[in-house]
Structures are given as structure tokens and as C-alpha cells.
Amino acid sequence: MKKKIFLAGLMGSAVLLAACGGGDDNGGGASAPAANSTGTATPTTTAAFSCPSDYKKMSLSNSSVIANANLNLRTDDGIAVLTIKTPADGKTGDLIICLGKPNPVPAGVKADYVYEVKSSSDLHAMASSTLTLNFTTNTVPNPNPPVIEFADVSNGAVTYKSLTQGASYATAPNYTLAASAQDSGLYVVRLTK
């Protein structure tokens, strides 16, 4: 009797797994397109890209972008400006770009200024993407002038990576720093290291 109950339970589990898409590592559900009776594939849906509500957002498409245009995205605090230069052919693809201050700042990131660039596609398709930070501080930076770095947060560890720096202006207490920002992620300024 116990064997029959066990067998019935095992078969029920197998049917349930098959109906739910099996035990793959993609969170359940079928991950491959399913064929219907006419032989055409039905694509799987992916989550839509969105910006956090307090970030600034810019949407681009092939039909609305002109060649070699400089487009600016500025945070409400006026400190961060992301300047995107469109390609010479004007073709950007459909693209959403976000700029803002993460709240809260990810654990382990220690910096005086932290801004995040998010993109639904590759910013390397643009002619350039530059982040400029304009701020006033009474802290004496070390090194001076300070620089913008990329904070790579992975596996609970934070690695600060150097970036190609642009023009900077450093006359205390006013600072303007610029750096290439063609990757989605956190851009930071550490006034003291």
C-alpha cells in the first residue's frame, strides 16, 4: 500500500513539473519558443526595461535621432550630466537611458558622490557617452583633482575601476569632473581614499 501511495505521489510530481516547464534553472516555465499547430514559433516574453521613478530618462529610436547630436540628461540636484553623442549615421536602435542617484547606495560602496547610468542597450553604439559631475566641497581631495571611477559591485565585493577622464576643473571649492560613461553601472567620486 505504501509503495502505491509513493508511486502515485511521484507520478503527480512528474506531471506537475512537466506542466510547469520542468526543473530548469530559468525560474520554471518553458524557456524555448513553443510551436503551435501551424508551425510558427511563439516568442517568450521578457521583462520590460524601466528606470527607477526618481531617475531621469531619455528614450531614443532610429526614427527620431539625428546624426552627431549631443543629447543631455541632467539629475534634479544639478550635479550629474550625461551627454550622449549620437553616431554619424544617426542610427541608435531603440534605446532607453537612465541617470540618477541610487537610493540606497549598494552595500560596500564608499564614495562622496554616487550616480548610476542604466541603459536598455549598449551605449558603445553611440559616438560617445560622457558623465560630468559639477560640485562644491570644502573637503580637500586626495588625490587632487579627484577623478570619476566605475564602482563594480559583484559577489558582495566592490572594485573601483579607473576610467578615461575628460576635461576637469578643480579650483577649491568648485570641481567639474568628466569621464567616459559607456557602461551601465555606478560612477563615483571618492574625495579621500
Model-derived regions: residue spans:
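Proteolytic-maturation and junctional protease-sensitive modules
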Residues: 124-192
